[in-house]
Every structure is written in C-alpha cells, then in structure tokens.
C-alpha cells in the first residue's frame, strides 16, 4: 500500500510538472489532460489548481471550437463540471460555447446556474440577459399583463366548452394559460403543443404549479407534426390559438389552421344542419383595417430625405432603401412591415384617409384560409380626406373570438399588440404630397402568408391637377414612371445602385447635426495641423536662406472610421482635404455605395478613401495601424448602440486605439457622459415582468416567466414613454476614452446622491448620453434629431419616495454592462 501511495504521488508530481511545461509551450490540450489526471487522483488540490485548470480548459476549448470538434469540446466541459460542479466560471464558459454553437436553450440553463452560484458575476448576468431576450421575447410579458385580453379569451373558451366542445388543442401554448382556461372551464381532454424548448419546459412547470399536470397533455412539437393517434387519440372539437402578430398573419396562423382543419379538427358545423360533434377555432374571425398616414418619425427611418450631408452630395447614383421593401422574391425572409405603438411615436402621426377595410378572415373556413394562402391580390381605392405627406400605411385588426367577445388592436386601444407599419418606398426621394380628393390605390395580398400592402398608383383629383407645380407627382403616368425606375441595377452606366440600410442607418444618414459635428471636429484638427506647418516654415526661413528652406510636409492625416454599419464619415473627412480616410464597412453593398459617392464628390482621383477591412481586425479583433509606418491621426469609434446601450468592449477598443495614435492624435468621440433620471412608469413594469397573479386571472405564472426578465429596456423613445419624472437629470457615468485615469468608475460600485423633486414610486432609471466629440462639440442622444434610441434600467424593487428626499443610487459598471440599485443613505 505504501508503495502504491508513493507511486501515485510521483505520478501526480510528474503530471503537474508536465502540465506546467505544456502551458509554457502553449500546448493547452496536453496540459488540460495532465491537470485532469492530477485532480482526479488528488481532489484535495482542486482549490489550489483551479485557476490553472480553468485557464488550460478555456484555451483548449477555443482550439477545439476553431477545429469544429464540438463533441470533444463538450466532453471536456462535462469532465470539468464533474470536478467543479458548483464553479460559476466554468458554467458560464460552457454556456458561451453552447450559445455560439446555436444551443440557446441549453446555454440559458448554464448561464442561469452560473448566476445562481454567483449572483454578482457580471459576465454570467450579461450572458443570461442576452439569451433571455432570445428565448422569451418581451411581448410575452406584455400579453400576460393584458387583463382584458385574458378575460376575453377565457370567456370565449368557456362558451365553447359549455356549448359542447370536449376536446381542446392549444396551438403555440406559450405559458399554457389558454390550456388552463380550457381545463378550468371543464374540458375533459386538453392538449397543448409548443415548439420552443424553453417555453415548453416553462409551460410544464406552470401547469404543475397550478395542479393541472396529468390533466393537460403538453407536446414539444409543431402542430404540423402532431399525428393521430400517436400524439392525440382523435380529432379535437376546439382549437385555441393566439399565433397572431401585429400584421395578424406573421406568426403563421393561416398555414397552421389550414393544417389543423385538414388533419386535427373535426369538420366545421354545417350552416344548414345540426350535428352533435363539430370543430371550431378560437379566434373565429378577424377584420383587418388600414389607414394612409403622414408620420415624420417613420419617414426619417425609412426614407433618405437629404440630398447633401455635411458637404457630401448623395446624388442619384445610389438608391438607399430599407430591407422591408428591398425584395419581393420567393426566398425573401424579411417581413414586409415593421411594427410600432403608433400612440407612442415621437411627433405623432396624421391620418390622411379614413380607416378602410383591408380584408376579412374566417378562421373557421378552410376555403377562406386557402384563398388567403393562394396569394391573390386585391386592389383597393382609398380616398384622401386630409392633405399631407404620404409616408406609410398602418394596419390593425379586430379579432372576433366568438359571437360575443372581441379584441381590437387599433392605435387608440390600450392593448398588448402594436400596429403594423408599411413604409411606402415606391416614391421619389422628395416624397409625395397628397391632397383632399386624391385617391391612393393599394394592392393587398398575402403571397407568402404575410400581409402585404403595396402602393399601386395615386390618382389626383381635378383640384390637385391644377396645382401640379406644387406636387411631387403630377399624374398617374408620372407615378408609373417613378415606380418603373425604382428597381434598377448597375448593368447600365446611368442606373442607380441599390443600397439596403437598416432603419437606424437611414435615420443616421438623415441626422445632419451628427455629421456636421464630426466635420467641425475634424476641421479643427486639420486647422491645427496647418498652423503647425505654418510655424515650421517661419522657423526654417529664419534659420537659413529662404531658398534653402525645407519644403512643407505633404503628409496627410490618417483618419480611421470603425463605426458599425454604413458610415459616410470617411467621405466627409476626405472632402476636407489633407486627409487620407479609411472606412471599415463590412458589407460589399455598402463599400460599392461609398465608392459611387466618392466619384460623385470628386474623391476618387487622389486616393483619399481606402477600405481597410483586411487591416482592421487582428486575431484579437483590434484595429491595426495603416500600411505605412504612419500612425493614426484620428480614430472614430462607435460608442453607443442604436438601441441605447454602451457598445460592448468599448473601453478595451479605446485602449487599443490609444496605442495606435500618433503623438497628438485623437479618438472621436473623446468622452461619453451618461445622463440619468428617476421615473415612475407602470408601462415599463408591465413590459418587463408579469405583475403578480391578478392579470393572469389567478393562475401562478409570474414566478416562472419572471426568471427571464431583463432589467435593461432598450429602443425607447423617452419623450413618449408614459412616465412621471421623480428627479432632475443627473450624471450617471463618465467615460473618458482619451484619458482613462479620469473615469469615475474606478471603484466597483459608484454611489450617486439623487434629490427627489416629486413624490411617487421609483420604478426605473432612464438614461441617455452626451457624446463629446471634442472638448467643445457634443451630441445629445435624446435630441429630436437623434438616430439613437434611449434606454431604461428597471429596478428590482420599486421604491416609494417623498419630495425633498435624498437617495443613493448604486451603479456598477463592468465590461460594458451595468446594474443599478436605489437605497436610502444610512442615518
């Protein structure tokens, strides 16, 4: 026995030495194997060797990932978790690999476990919030908090069961609430299907918590995959579903119900006879309504309304448009509409027409559903009753659950649904002014079971024809010509290049203040360079005969723009002269558009613009210096995401950028100041978590789905979010990208004193940014022209406050993620 123990000790010692040597030589796989052996033989050394083991595991896992050896990667993590079952760092790392390989449900489980093991882990928290947004979309909370919607569905289901429906199938059950309505109403047999693994597991928990397990059969599958009698014993008499989006058809209700009527439902009740067993659907029918609308906010996100930006002519060579109308092909996966809560759109909107009926849908008629799926088009003439700029169609629907109960999603209704918005893009860049008496002709179709509204023509009234000089389009022929000219290619020299931009990128292109501010800041740097050169010439002429003076340097400023997405800042910089600008655009379409614009603006002959995607990224994703030995004069960083959050790894990117600047070089912007305000907002509460059992009519759902709540609410328009300000604005955070030593987040937690200016209940901290390009020029992301949205952090527990109180807001900022907590100072 003594000999075996000594042999074991020698093996452990040799393996440990070998692991150390392997790590020095970056042989991470062998090092991991040696350490695994050591810890298996000597578990008492786990604590001492934990960091070394983690390092070798993570490095080896990265190599396995690069080699596409996913199974070996997961085997390593399973071995590691056997040794360290409660290690939050390993759990979090395992989740990261699962997420990047597409296993989001499984990743969520590991992130959640890591967060439970270490609630203060910023990495695990950020990862869990990110995956939670993927798995449980925010509309689940809004829908479950919609008491009226829940009451109407419950009443309609009760009526159906009282009228003889005995077998119920809930398609797309989500949390299972409709199934529980059916069971509580007395349905003998209730089945429910859900495709999402996370939602299915959540529904299982919820059904069990409400003492209905064994009474509701939950199926983890699409309804299209349900087989009789393998999954359910027979055809059902009632299908309940809420697979409808703002455009009604976007979640596939038409295809789903066509399949259900053919394979899962009893035959519908005949109109001229009475049968004991028949099939029906809740909702029974719907009417879609539409309206032509003027809306400046929609316009600036979906139509480029400027011909020149900070000295850069946009011209006619490039046609910018959003993805929504860029393609109508059979393989196009882009929804033909966006969605908005029209009652909350900044600046509001103006109705140019009365509401018109787009189409009616009978969900209890297989023939009606198949007609919709056929994609046949219907043309509707819409009279204009009020003059305005025609920007978009909006649609909403009235959902008839049964003969007695209905729901409406019209803009004036307080409902969980938004409205569908169809920006009109088949118009000249100047837009389209319509007058009272004109007629807008629209084609309505569902070629891929998505609702589409396409502008056909605008027929002018006689009074409008008399004012054609004031109109963008004089008659129907002009419009047809404009529509024909829209879809062009670059096959001919004079044709437009199509460049597809996201709505945020279009709003950025329309943001004149943004571009002019950067132009002014770059101009100041060029001016200071010219002053230095002038002083150099004077010194040289004083020191020697002017004929032998050294020539002025012809070196140009090297400006690197690493903005995300499409950016014309390199063109603006190059246009100023004495600048060689580098663009890091990634999409070929964007690069071609910038090249076209450089030709229009006479920047193509002197090599003022260069694309540096190949130079931009190192193995670590860091910016490199130019091809020449010269360092960067200006590096432009994209610091704030359009959604309203600080970009991930901003401080790390700024640190790399500082190392690549020439002496006197600058990072634009040089500083970011986060501004905040305490508010009371029931709306944000309802959009972020289920508010107890009352809105869900007594069912226990909130504790389960609220595990997936995320405190940061993004893409907000603070000017229209229903809220009550309870404090003045105050500085939350300051990030100096040029001088990191002056940043105020040096400690792990910052404590900010906030004075309460109004009594109420603090539910959230809204925030936005002042972006300081240089010491004198700044941008406000909350301004009316801003292309950035704002954000809010919803507090874990609302706090009642009194006017005149002083509270402490604890802010933790780490790795570009943030958490906040409101407390009262100790007396």
Swiss-Prot record:
Belongs to the class I-like SAM-binding methyltransferase superfamily. Protein arginine N-methyltransferase family. The keyword Transferase applies. Arginine methyltransferase that can both catalyze the formation of omega-N monomethylarginine (MMA) and symmetrical dimethylarginine (sDMA). It is found in: Cytoplasm. Pfam families: PrmA, PRMT_C. The gene is prmt9. It comes from the Eukaryota. TPR repeats lie at residues 54-87, 88-121. This is Protein arginine N-methyltransferase 9.
